[in-house]
Amino acid sequence: MIKAQKLVDSYPISFLLSLAFCLRIYNIQSPILGVHSWRQADTAAMARNFYENGYNFFYPQIDWGGNLAGYCQTEFPIYSFSVAILYKFFGVHESIGRLLSIIFSLIAIYFFYKLCLEITCDKKLAFWSSFFYTIIPTNIYYSRTFQPESLVLMSAISGTYFFYKWIKNDHKKYLFISSLLICLACLVKVVPAFYLFLPFTYLVWQKFKYKMFSNLNLYLYTAIIIIPTFAWYFHSYQVANEYRLSFGFSAEKLGWNFQGLGIMFEQIVYFIAVRHLLVVGFIIMIFGIFCRRENKEEIFFDMLFISNILYIIVFANIHSSHEYYQLFFLITASVYMGKVFTRNRYSTKIINVIIVVFLLTGSLFYSLEYMTKENPNNSELFELAQIIKQTVPKNSLIIATTGNDPTILYLSDRKGWIPSPNAINQTYLLDRFKDGAKYLVGGYNFVQAYQSSMEEKDKKKIREVVSRSSNSILNSENFFLIKL
């Protein structure tokens, strides 16, 4: 035990990165299933379409465009494009996308440790903060999924580190590197601009005071971030107008849903306190917020925390829908958790008990909530995808009743439409048949990957449609597949 502790003290980053890699590499070969498979399926589909249809970076393609080319308004597709390039050398394997996410997450952990150490000058705090950031179950999961979250976090954290280095050393190379990294983060997900503005402004004010308004380097820094970001999203908006396909960058997703305000914020608290921090971690974080600050530089993390809270409140609608929008919140949460273990006089025994409870709770939660749902042997959706692969010709367009969830299209390597079951009627089927649809497919026991059963009225209606068809290929207790 003593030797192990000395090893951790001597090589903290090596220990953290090794631990992070081991936690994330498990089940890397899993197909696109489970929690938020719909988001992963879109990202994976873009990568596969880049690989199969030519590397047209400015026009990413999805699978649910029906008889259209599938050009879609998306975030900056550098992640999918990078995976597609790797496909050229290694073939199409989901594990490549997952491995790329893991690599980005390891870089993020490295710079998170360096940032904590740079700001606090406390090696022990930097380690404990990074340790909790490494083992939080949701952070483990989303840093090995087939989506660009780990790229955004890596870019934002490393960009923040280099910005802080510039503040302290005044070397322009740090500012330039930071501008490129923050620009990349904003291109992929524009939200870093919201939660980094306040802490960056705090750092600049501490250094320059009113002279910040006449600092040309800061204007150039801002321009490097804003101009490419605006250019991409303007282009993406034009794609949406021309091809009528979008990931849903709309005003309806912003702000508040006043009719369900209580439920909305209750869901956000549930995401943060229960799913992210497992209650135990949330309590530790609350204690950490009130721990002393050793220097004024540490206020940076308080500014980042406040910025995150404001961002969550202002954009509460999207935060109540998807848990991965709070991933950046885990940075400050981890710092506060780390402070509890370094700035309070708790006995080693108490610390060990808390860590064991957190690890056991996290392991159980991660296994039951995430890993079991990635098991194809437990998935009717995956089973149906294999039936489609074997039954439906490769280039035939299908209608899948998965309610805007493209997972079935990706897993079956088919293209088509993904309406909700309640949209299915003879008029809809006739219109899609005229558009080139050849098959209607679906499952009676699931709609979206996150909706485990179809409503009885929709199930009854679809059974009637299937029973009237003279070209029914499959109509079992679980699945239906008919030729139109």
Model-derived segments and their meaning:
Residues 141-151:
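Short acidic/glycine- and proline-prone juxtamembrane loop motifs at membrane-interface regions
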Residues 25-29, 42-71, 78:
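Extracytosolic helix-loop segments that constitute the early lumenal/periplasmic catalytic or substrate-binding loops
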Residues 196-197, 378, 389-433, 437-448:
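Short periplasmic/luminal acceptor-recognition loop of GT-C membrane glycosyltransferases, typified by
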Residues 96-120, 158-162:
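Transmembrane-helix motifs of polytopic, lipid-linked glycan transferases
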Residues 42-53, 184, 195-299, 308-323, ...:
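Transmembrane-lumen/periplasm boundary regions of multi-pass, lipid-linked membrane glycan transferases
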Residues 20-21, 129-134, 182, 186, ...:
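Short helix- or helix-capping micro-motifs
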Residues 117-124, 159-175, 185, 341:
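Membrane-interface transmembrane helices that cradle and orient dolichyl/undecaprenyl
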Residues 192, 340-376:
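Transmembrane alpha-helical segments
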